[in-house]
UniProtKB/Swiss-Prot annotation:
This is Large ribosomal subunit protein uL3. Keywords: Ribonucleoprotein, Ribosomal protein, RNA-binding, rRNA-binding. Pfam families: Ribosomal_L3 (PF00297). It comes from Fusobacterium nucleatum subsp. nucleatum (strain ATCC 25586 / DSM 15643 / BCRC 10681 / CIP 101130 / JCM 8532 / KCTC 2640 / LMG 13131 / VPI 4355). One of its GO terms (molecular function) is rRNA binding. The gene is rplC. The keyword Repeat does not apply.
Amino acid sequence: MSGILGKKIGMTQIFEDGKFVPVTVVEAGPNFVLQKKTEEKDGYVALQLGFDEKKEKNTTKPLMGIFNKAGVKPQRFVKELEVESVDGYELGQEIKVDVLTEVGYVDITGTSKGKGTSGVMKKHGFSGNRASHGVSRNHRLGGSIGMSSWPGKVLKGKKMAGQHGNATVTVQNLKVVKVDAEHNLLLIKGAVPGAKNSYLVIKPAVKKVIG
């Protein structure tokens, strides 16, 4: 399995080898297979998974058609995950957190906390200008944003003030401390993106951990 959908519950700490280890508790599953995407029909191979049951009255008719066909109740978080093959999977099949039992490290994708419109000092860590000595009303400004008549524009990627957070973020190589199959919980060492109760995509780590 290439991954599983989950929800961030919060952070706590456990005692391991004589040391406190900060961990994030993630509710991972059960997921349900809603659709199977094939190379012949869709041009790619993937599974559409659903997680976190919700009320039918809050579900659109197109989505209800998908849920009814799979024989599952409406799910709040629906996402496609690429797999090598859809063979062995059936519509409505339940996928639990134990698929990650043998996985030591994971990559987790979530939506970071939104912080609204922020200036360059908060958003990018600029040091700002001096408090006095020639500085007038420019203490927290970003300074020059480009050249003059050539190129006559602000270059792409220039760090400026604007929306801060509320973006898709992936954190790689997070250690799986414990898999609680009975309660569908994952204990992940360290922090993961997003606020409490935000949704996550958990996949086996792509990169190898050295050492």
